Amino acid sequence: MESLKIYNTLAREKQTFVPIEPGRVRMYVCGMTVYDYCHVGHARVMVVFDMVQRWLRASGYDVTYVRNITDIDDKIIKRAVENGETIGALTNRFIAAMHEDADALGVQRPDREPRATEYVPQMLSMIGRLQDNGLAYQAADGDVNYAVRKFPGYGKLSGKSLEDLRAGERVAANDAKQDPLDFVLWKSAKADEPAESRWASPWGEGRPGWHIECSAMSCDLLGTHFDLHGGGADLQFPHHENEIAQSEGASGSTFVNTWMHNGFVRVNDEKMSKSLGNFFTIRDVLKVYDPEVVRFFILRSHYRSDLNYSDVHLDDARHALTRLYTALKDVPAEAQARPDWNEPHGKRFREAMHDDFNTPVAMAVLFELATEVNKTRSPALASQLAALGGVMGLLVRDPHAFLQGGVGAAADGLDAAEVEARIEARRAAKAARDFARADGIRADLLAAGIVLEDKPGGVTEWRRA
């Protein structure tokens, strides 16, 4: 069997994936900071690494998947104060919203979903070890900082020297730091900050810095050396670089073997940002597009490439997914079928996924298989199509339910009951040999985005275009 190859950001090349413990994969992904609704960029992280963990499990690995929740930081405190609510009320509300969004997108829950506020003792312990190892110091302002110049490997993930990083990054001047690149491990409490945002520590009251949260949680749940760490490309520096410095500085050993980063999301070929007014929450998108269409759209691009969000691309994804479901509509597929990896399409699908999770090529195999199903009407091939799609979290619904579903209603507000009523009126018109009226009803439905298919025996099926 071919080996799984993954592009390792740390090595800057595709490498054969060899887990530390044979047959077992320990995997950590940086999750959401819960002070607002999740946006399309978050959707990509959720779906991409859901695809990764699904494929690892389908390949026979015992996977422990951890994705954290950041439920304390400056933005959270600021938003809670602005809203006049507690930090806990704010974060619990947006954690629930995040779960709703993830569930809609077919994202399986991680095995562990630690909240930063639950791991403060572990963070304090790690900061203490860093200080003991000469890698951390308490500054005049009360903050505890990491001394980057004391860690020889700093910059290895981004591939830059300290000099390059200082020149290329916008680092705020801070007289309390020994080096502009030094980053905070423990933030001293400010007088005007709420009591629930501070914890006691050997360095005085305060709260953890963002970077130490992920190091402490991942090492506590997966061990100080684990297989796979993922996140968006925007986290490569400084967040992931700082995680390496913290974790390896505390343990003295390798932190993570393989680093994965998904590409950026762009909107109509521009960077997505609130300032440009092209910022979309997952909820905004799901008001217009079926969640499975959004998942399909995300997986249609390779995870390392930038993803260009536009209505044109989402409409195209909807039509493409409709083609796959249409192939399954009238051919009985075995429920809960497992992929046949010895069948030619199964072999090519696995080859694609084993090549750095090449979902665009894997999807091309699905369309080839759909063409064969349309030609042969083979239940075995239909089962294979549904099974391979299922590995990616796609094609898991009843085909008729997908084809007749849709978000909201059709263009003129028709729901399923109204469509059926018009089909019945068309049937009555045909029985009365009023073919002009029957054709008019069909044309009106088509204009409303409803496609009719007349079947033998006087049966009419329909789907949304």
UniProtKB/Swiss-Prot annotation:
The gene is cysS. Its cofactor is Zn(2+). A motif ('KMSKS' region) lies at residues 271-275. The keyword Ligase applies. It is found in: Cytoplasm. It comes from Ralstonia nicotianae (strain ATCC BAA-1114 / GMI1000). The lineage of its organism: Bacteria, Pseudomonadati, Pseudomonadota, Betaproteobacteria, Burkholderiales. Its EC number is 6.1.1.16. This is Cysteine--tRNA ligase. ATP binds at K274. NCBIfam families: cysS. It catalyses: tRNA(Cys) + L-cysteine + ATP = L-cysteinyl-tRNA(Cys) + AMP + diphosphate. It is an enzyme of class 6 (ligase). Zn(2+) binds at C30, C214, H239, E243. A motif ('HIGH' region) lies at residues 32-42.
